[in-house]
Amino acid sequence: AIMRYVRRQHSMIIGQVTAEEIKIQIGEVYPRNEELTMNVKGRDYKTGMPKMVTVSSKEIYEVLRRPARMIADEVMAVLEQTSPELVSDVSENGLTLTGGSAQLWGFAELLMERTGIPCILADDPDSCTAYGCGKSLAWINNMEEGPINIARKRAMKSGL
């Protein structure tokens, strides 16, 4: 989304690495009090020559706002289909955010506002998701045969 925005608004082509740097340094999904700016280097869309523009956090907010809200909506959808016991546990203990996007300015606040559930950032959000997936491989056979998954499979087959 950031690459497309820079191309359309600034007539400049940037790569994925630069887009990620923009997201990390000035990205926000919840408005902050101060506006940040960043000089971004790329290639002019028309001439192909090197070009530099200044991009603001307010611009990036407009780019990231919709995808972040879509993620929040999906979290809400999952919570709505989660068992009452688990939702009670989650509402008491909060949501732990993982992954790179969890570190976006205001992401925890956005989710907290939408769900009403406290959100915290994991200690090592970039790698804890992969670590957890690796640990879960030890339990994969049990997970396939567990009563919850059997009930889920039945519900999915019946179209619920």
Residue map of PLM features:
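Phosphate-binding glycine-rich/basic clefts of nucleotide- and phosphate-handling proteins
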Residues: A1-R65, M76
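Residue-level signature of catalytic and energy-coupling elements of molecular machines
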Residues: I2, V75, L97, C133
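Interdomain boundary/hinge elements
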Residues: I13-T18, D89, D123-P125
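Acidic, glycine/GT-rich loop-and beta-edge segments that sit at the periphery of enzyme/chaperone cores
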Residues: G15, K135, W139-L160
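Glycine-rich phosphate-binding loops at beta-strand->alpha-helix junctions
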Residues: P31, V87-L111
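Active-site lining segments that contact anionic ligands and/or coordinate catalytic metals
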Residues: E35, E92, G116
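Phosphate/ATP-binding catalytic cores across multiple sugar-kinase/actin-like superfamilies
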Residues: V63-V90, S136-W139
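Conserved phosphate-binding/catalytic loops in two-lobed NTP-binding clefts
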Residues: E109-K135, W139, M143
